[in-house]
Amino acid sequence: MPVEWLLIPFAYLLGSVSSAVIVSRTLGLPDPRQEGSKNPGATNVLRLGGKRAAILTLLGDASKGLIPLLIAKSMAVSPPLFAAIGFAAFVGHLYPVFFQFKGGKGVATALGVLLGFAWPVGLMALLTWIGVAALFRFSSLSALAAAVLAPVYVWLWLGSAELVVATLFMSMLLVYRHKGNIERLLKGEEARLGAKRL
């Protein structure tokens, strides 16, 4: 097996590391899997521990998607393998082997993957999230909007079928992981950014 193929399991294992749990334990915060929305992600950590903890979680989760792709770029891997490596990191965050395959929703890790594909694509997705969040104050709605548009951004900027397909699958999984949020949005029960979830 060519050594570059080992980047797929490496990306998955790195994705399986929970930044939210590590940050929360380090800072003495409640376990985000047990408190708040019970999602080990930056938004829940923001509610439980404030901006500093949330930023550290966001950077950690995004790095899980970005680092394997930076390594892959340095090895000049093929486009299909490059796409698979990014997708593996994302799946690792959603279904982590270290936490009984119960992970987060993948927003920050998906951002890291998109930045790894091409930084302008990641920037466009981030600006979409920020714009929707500024207008509506819903983290989940912002994530859904960015997820829906991400494959379009990849297609327009990169034109790579492999990367478009990988991004499309990431987007579908991300939307699926937000099904509870979608139900609450439709019922008018979703917590806005800055609100404490009890």
Swiss-Prot record:
Topology term for the membrane: Multi-pass membrane protein
Keywords in alphabetical order: Cell inner membrane, Cell membrane, Lipid biosynthesis, Lipid metabolism, Membrane, Phospholipid biosynthesis, Phospholipid metabolism, Transferase, Transmembrane, Transmembrane helix
Pfam families linked: G3P_acyltransf
Chain ranges passing through the membrane: 3-23, 81-101, 113-133, 153-175
Top-level taxon in the UniProt lineage: Bacteria
The EC number(s) this enzyme carries: 2.3.1.275
EC top class, as a word: transferase
Record protein name field: Glycerol-3-phosphate acyltransferase
Single Gene Ontology MF annotation: acyl-phosphate glycerol-3-phosphate acyltransferase activity
Annotated GO biological process: phospholipid biosynthetic process
Source organism per UniProt: Methylococcus capsulatus (strain ATCC 33009 / NCIMB 11132 / Bath)
SMART domains: G3P_acyltransf
Subunit structure: Probably interacts with PlsX.
PANTHER family from the UniProt entry: GLYCEROL-3-PHOSPHATE ACYLTRANSFERASE-RELATED, INNER MEMBRANE PROTEIN YGIH
Main localization category: membrane
Positions of disulphide bridges: none
Cited function: Catalyzes the transfer of an acyl group from acyl-phosphate (acyl-PO(4)) to glycerol-3-phosphate (G3P) to form lysophosphatidic acid (LPA). This enzyme utilizes acyl-phosphate as fatty acyl donor, but not acyl-CoA or acyl-ACP.
GO cellular component: plasma membrane
Pathway connected to this protein: Lipid metabolism; phospholipid metabolism
Family statement: Belongs to the PlsY family.
